[in-house]
């Protein structure tokens, strides 16, 4: 899919609150004698595209042919946006173009200074007329709302209705607690906080998530309902609830993660990619973005590199693993096996196991353990080779090798939340079941086993 998408250049129109993100990098090593505050010595300034302009930058970085429509003030920030974006901007005299100045010290944001005018624009009719003139040439429309006054109810209604007549998808990154102005859009991408405010729910845990995301779809006549869940991934409701798990390995700055998500979703829908696959790809894009500092764009090459993470680093000792698990409050899924010759059945089984939680750990029998269990002719592949093959799958987070005949000692040491075994354990004692919160039995794909593969090879000789 990535190879296909990286060759596409869909025309995408973006309307919304275009902003300037400024980063003032400082050295803060002294305390002021005037007051108990830090002295910030300016080292450099970095002006970047922000808000809807960052969505534009993400789409352009992905390879889209992007066109911006918006309203800016007659100021330096407005000029900066016009000079750096392809599109058409209406100039509202006296209006302040949103400008956010982040004061950075030692890679940490210590203060943000905002200049903006959040009143509704005076040029609604002109913006709608401009949209009507341009829309027929595009494959998707993005409404990027930061509640700075451009996306008024009148503008949103006109855009969504016109696009719907032309069968052009409209994707909305919403703001505020009233989503009525987005009714009829293809999808919205609220985060958990925004969704809670719109739904007036106390939480989105357990059954509430499915109830809430379904309610958004029905209440606002959406084609798809999406809620971004930060480190838990992306929730999608089409005909039912699905969760695309998050992919981030390290998080430095969440600025712009939502922009990358809607950019990837728009790019995918413009190319008629299935929606759940689009959500999975959006997660990978967000993982790239949060590993950097500031509002940054993401490319398909970066997503490819992210997917090719050094898999040997995923092979850990149980002691290393325990330290890592203590640092994060994640739902841990554990399964184990010999995985001597990895086959299609293993892949389907492990993929299903991963979907049960946040982190999937595979306990792998050592060579000595396999030999005791399977006989002198096994294993076919060494423990290191087997561990590397398992670690190469994106849905496997960690592999840990154990020498015992059963994983009981390892399970007791790591104390995972969920223990996964094959459905053939239905009437058997599951080792470690008394240690974990729950046991899940997963059906194997019929006709696939390492023993059958070995016999097949022998028969051909």
UniProtKB/Swiss-Prot annotation:
It is an enzyme of class 2 (transferase). InterPro entries: Bifunc_HldE, Cyt_trans-like, PfkB_dom, RfaE_dom_I, RfaE_dom_II, Ribokinase-like, Rossmann-like_a/b/a_fold. The active site is at 259. Gene3D superfamilies: 3.40.1190.20, HUPs. GO terms for cellular component: cytosol. It catalyses: D-glycero-beta-D-manno-heptose 7-phosphate + ATP = D-glycero-beta-D-manno-heptose 1,7-bisphosphate + ADP + H(+); D-glycero-beta-D-manno-heptose 1-phosphate + ATP + H(+) = ADP-D-glycero-beta-D-manno-heptose + diphosphate. Pfam families: CTP_transf_like, PfkB. The keyword Transferase applies. Keywords: ATP-binding, Carbohydrate metabolism, Kinase, Multifunctional enzyme, Nucleotide-binding, Nucleotidyltransferase, Transferase. Homodimer. PANTHER family: BIFUNCTIONAL PROTEIN HLDE. In the N-terminal section; belongs to the carbohydrate kinase PfkB family. In the C-terminal section; belongs to the cytidylyltransferase family. This is Bifunctional protein HldE.
């Amino acid at each position: 899919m990535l190879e296909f998408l990286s060759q596409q250049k869909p025309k995408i129109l973006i309307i919304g609150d275009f902003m300037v993100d400024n980063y003032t990098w400082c050295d803060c090593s002294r305390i002021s004698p005037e007051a108990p505050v830090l002295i910030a010595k300016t080292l450099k300034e970095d002006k970047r595209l922000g808000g809807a302009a960052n969505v534009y930058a993400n789409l352009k970085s992905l390879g889209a042919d992007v066109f911006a429509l918006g309203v800016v003030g007659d100021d330096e920030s407005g000029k900066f946006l016009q000079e750096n974006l392809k599109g058409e901007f209406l100039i509202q005299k006296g209006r302040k173009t949103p400008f956010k100045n982040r004061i950075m010290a030692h890679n940490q944001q210590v203060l943000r200074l905002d200049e903006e005018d959040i009143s509704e624009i005076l040029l609604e009719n002109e913006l709608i007329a401009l949209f009507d003139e341009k829309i027929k040439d595009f494959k998707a429309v993005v409404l990027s709302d930061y509640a700075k006054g451009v996306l008024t109810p009148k503008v949103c209604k006109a855009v969504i209705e016109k696009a719907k007549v032309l069968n052009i998808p409209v994707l909305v990154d919403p703001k505020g607690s009233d989503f009525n102005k987005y009714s009829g859009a293809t999808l919205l991408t609220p985060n958990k906080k925004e969704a809670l405010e719109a739904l007036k729910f106390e939480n989105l845990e357990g059954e509430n998530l499915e109830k809430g995301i379904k309610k958004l779809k029905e209440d606002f006549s959406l084609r798809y309902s999406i809620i971004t869940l930060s480190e838990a991934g992306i929730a999608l409701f089409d005909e039912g609830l699905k969760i695309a798990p998050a992919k981030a390995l390290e998080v430095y700055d969440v600025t712009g993660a939502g922009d990358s998500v809607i950019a990837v979703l728009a790019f995918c829908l413009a190319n008629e990619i299935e929606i759940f696959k689009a959500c999975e790809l959006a997660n990978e894009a967000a993982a790239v973005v949060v590993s950097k500092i500031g509002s940054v764009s993401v490319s398909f090459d970066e997503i490819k590199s992210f997917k090719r993470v050094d898999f040997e680093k995923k092979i850990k000792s149980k002691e290393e693993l325990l330290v890592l698990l203590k640092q994060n409050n994640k739902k841990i899924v554990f399964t184990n096996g010999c995985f001597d010759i990895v086959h299609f059945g293993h892949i389907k089984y492990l993929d299903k196991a991963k979907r049960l939680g946040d982190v999937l750990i595979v306990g792998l029998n050592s060579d000595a353990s396999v030999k005791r269990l399977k006989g002198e002719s096994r294993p076919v592949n060494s423990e290191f080779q087997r561990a590397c093959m398992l670690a190469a799958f994106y849905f496997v987070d960690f592999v840990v090798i154990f020498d015992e005949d059963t994983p009981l000692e390892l399970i007791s040491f790591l104390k995972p939340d969920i223990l996964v075994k094959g459905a053939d354990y239905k009437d058997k004692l599951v080792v470690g079941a008394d240690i974990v919160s729950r046991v899940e039995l997963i059906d194997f794909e019929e006709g696939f086993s390492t023993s059958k593969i070995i016999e097949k090879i022998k028969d051909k000789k």
